[in-house]
A protein has these predicted regions:
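Charged, glycine-rich active-site and insertion segments that engage polyanionic ligands
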Residues: 2-73, 77-102, 178-181, 187-303, ...
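A short hydrophobic beta-strand->loop->alpha-helix junction that borders the nucleotide-binding pocket
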Residues: 56-57, 113-118
Length: 357
């Protein structure tokens, strides 16, 4: 195994795998991103492929799938001048091709993967991509390509870099080895280290339409292929076209939880404390349910802030609650604080802020 390669054969989990879905390297189809796919293909065919790409867009729209799809295509077609590349309409590679098999198995020789590593001592993923991971991945560029084509580094995602690992990656991108390619997944491109961002070509992926999101969910196979289309459409709409977000809502009774939270928020500044107590009991210690509830609160605040008419004084109470909710939610999870206390405190703040409007 080369430096930085995936751990497919080691039995360790992958931090870049969405729960309930195949890993992006195992995904053979891409929905709703024909424009982005064509831009990569055209650049490669024209012999002007930039050495670093920042694949931006909201989470769950196919950025990592596109990165692996492009890597698979380059491994299968290391020469851009071949008739196969000239005739290609997209970046698809037949499932039986050796490059496709190697990628699906997690052991493509010319690909390094940068992601949060698994801490076997704690049984959890590290919270950041550490500089050691970047150094290991850089070993790929100290060796010759096995197929004579590109050596590719896939980073998923840029938000997980800390300052040291970001600077270590920047050094590689600033002085790229010959025929090297960096595919950097970023959910919030504006937050990427400016010097790193400036050396990448930005490729923004489009939000998925409702139809594309439902098609992508169905293509995941069981159990999602058996879910009623109406439920898939509702989850996709609630997640704003994010496939990963839709999967989040499809777990357990989370759509119902989201609807109940929206009903409580719609009654503000009045608060039904009894119903909130029952809602908090339903969440319990489940972190995913807690994320649904905090997501509903933040989305509601975002919508209200957008309706504020631009008056900073009028928006100030809601903006303060927005910041407090984001900070307190992170602390509640990180420090394993009482989730019910967080919810009661948050709704008290929301009630006070909305009374001031």
């Amino acid at each position: 195994m080369r430096p930085g390669e995936g751990r497919a054969g080691e039995g360790l989990p992958d931090s870049d795998r969405q729960e309930g879905a195949p890993h992006p390297r195992e995904t053979g189809v891409l929905f709703g991103q024909a424009r982005a796919e064509a831009e990569l293909l055209d650049s490669y065919r024209a012999g002007r492929l930039h050495h670093a790409w920042l694949l931006g867009g909201r989470q769950g729209t196919g950025k990592a799938t596109l990165a692996w799809r492009f890597a698979r295509f380059l491994l299968a077609h290391p020469d851009p001048g071949t008739p196969e590349v000239r005739a290609a309409r997209d970046l698809s590679v037949p499932a039986g091709h050796p490059a496709a098999s190697a990628v699906a198995a997690g052991a493509p020789g010319d690909v390094a993967v940068l992601r949060r590593a698994f801490n076997e001592k704690s049984g959890k993923f590290f919270s950041e991509i550490r500089v050691d991971e970047v150094r290991r991945a850089s070993g790929l560029f100290q060796q010759a390509s096995r197929a004579g084509g590109y050596r590719i580094c896939i980073l998923d995602s840029a938000e997980d870099l800390n300052r040291n690992s970001a600077n270590a990656l920047l050094k590689l991108v600033e002085e790229p080895p010959q025929r090297s390619l960096f595919l950097v997944v970023a959910h919030h491109p504006a937050q990427v280290l400016p010097t790193l961002r400036s050396r990448c070509r930005l490729l923004l992926l489009d939000p998925l339409s409702g139809g594309d999101a439902v098609a992508a969910l169905t293509a995941l196979g069981p159990p999602w292929a058996g879910v009623a289309p109406e439920a898939l459409a509702e989850a996709a709409a609630r997640a704003g076209g994010s496939v990963g977000g839709a999967l989040h809502y499809l777990g357990g009774e989370r759509l119902a939880l989201d609807r109940d939270a929206a009903r409580l928020l719609g009654r503000l500044p009045a608060v039904d404390w009894g119903e909130l107590h029952r809602l908090a009991d339903r969440v319990g210690a489940d972190e995913d349910d807690f994320a649904v509830l905090t997501g509903a609160i933040l989305d509601w605040l975002h919508a209200r802030l957008g309706q504020g008419g631009g008056d900073p004084r009028r928006l100030a109470p809601l903006a303060e609650v927005w910041e407090k909710v984001r900070r307190s939610a992170r602390e509640t999870l990180a420090l394993n604080l009482d989730k019910k206390t967080f919810l009661f405190s948050t709704f008290a703040d929301l009630s006070q802020a909305t009374r001031a409007l």
